[in-house]
Amino acid sequence: MSGDVFGNGMLLSRHIRLVGAFDHRHIFLDPNPDAASSFVERQRLFELPRSSWADYDKSLISEGGGVWDRTVKSVPIAESVRIALGLAEGVTKLSPPELMQAILSAPVDLLWNGGIGTYVKASTETNAQVGDKSNDAVRVDGQDLRVKVIGEGGNLGVTALGRIEFSASGGHINTDAIDNSAGVDCSDHEVNIKILLDSLVRSQLLPTQERNPLLASMTDDVAALVLADNIAQNALLGISRVTASQMLGVHRRQLTDLTKARGLDRKLEALPTDKEIERRLEAGVGLTSPELATLTAHVKLSLKDDLLATELPDNDFFAQQIPQYFPTAVRDRFETEIKAHPLRRQIVATMLVNEVIDNGGITYAYRLAEETGASSTDSIRAYAAVREVFALDEVWSRIRSAGVSAEIENELIVESCRLLDRASRWFLANRPQPIAVGAEVARYSAAYRATAPLVPGLLAGHQLDDLLVRAQSVIDRGAPEALALDVFRLLDVYCLLDIADIADIADHDIAEVAELYYALDAHLGIDWLLSAVSGLERGDRWHSLARLALRDDLYSSLRQLTMEVLAGGEPGESPQEKIDEWESTNASRLSRARAALVEIFESGTLDLATLSVAARQVRSMVRSMGTRSEVGR
């Protein structure tokens, strides 16, 4: 449509009630629009050659509306228009620039920018700084907008600082790069498909006359692939907004690292200074959605650069994913040729980075580097291993197809990512490096499939109570019960990694080991301590590392205690009988630790110092303080 040169956004839904619009020639007003008839008329104008808003059927415009040339001296403002645009009482006429400002500032649901020009800035910016003199008389400040959402079909319609100001004022906006990403993604697919088809024609695997019809036949498939990428990226930003305040400390460190190591210019990218971040930390607010979008872009670019500097994109486990980038029509016929694509490394790297960041979060790889010293490729390998072992793709698919609210969906995804984080650290800390993803998946996925169904029946006491309370919080708000329980049980099945190792080392049936592990966990109250550790404030990096060290210490002790109790038990004994025998045999050593733990439990004090003492008491129960047994190295 005229003025919407990029996307024709007003033709993408039959339910739009278009109150006002303007381009370089006209101003359109329809204060009480009929969605159905106005859509049909917009469609007619779109199909009419050389049309403008002046061609709009005036009989379809509600009372008080109309179409005016931008060159008129003033436009009469009917009462219906005054109400629709939220103008002050007594306003009866406005100049064209004033009316366009009123349209931009109207209290409506959506402000759609599809044209050329910058129409919104921050109150801290001058028109001269914006650099779009032709729209100086029209431009408004982000803090003055009353719209709920801004959609940017065009580029540069809002300044970077204007977006941040609007977002900080409660508005919903990402960036033009995010809202326009489908176009770029579509172009990338088109170019890569054409490279493939041209190589097929040259090698005589595809007749020349079939090339163009085959390309055209893939239009819908390409659209689906592109939309899937866009949905995933917007889902990432949705979750990132939810966790923005609690992750601000990590974001600050990540920005500092990108600035020092990657040359990020915070001022140029409109990203907050350390001083501004300190202010937000005190206020309890995080990065805005536009800032998160910008950070995401830099994280993805830097991670992709890291991957392309290594052999990871050539690794068979990862390279085998490249056919999924292409539409089914060529994927099924030319899989071998796809795997030999000239840009296969770049395509594989892009696919991996998008998946890991979109699913794992903006800080996933960065936190693993902080916590374990993992390289970018290490984090990709860890992600892939955890995804496959715990069938996380299936979990995420169930969450996203459950039909729950965005709020509930985000909560469930965040909970699932706790398993992703924890299990990723486990693989990085406990398995040979670099992680041989295929071998690790073969080893642990079988153990998971065999044992995970048993876990619901093995939880008891605080383990079960905590699970039910957390799951009920989303069940009460509409989440399916089975899904909620499965998602909130993920941290309980995380232990199956240790359980699989114990079974292998001790040469015992994994189901027997699992029964003892969970029983001992509940008996000693380690699950209670782990929950308390999770409740500690994240604070700065050192507080976060202290929390991780505590958690790892508790899990390590539980692993060694399970092996010790298992070794002292007799075949055919129940888990409780094994525990009773172990406690009887080691009564003097255990009594001191148990007494200290009881005192801690009863004190109700759950700070870092107290929990550190508790972890030390649990560790003192272990007979041997030697090194951890190693498996499969």
Give residue spans per PLM region:
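Non-transmembrane, aqueous-exposed alpha-helical and coiled segments at domain scale
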Residues: 1-633
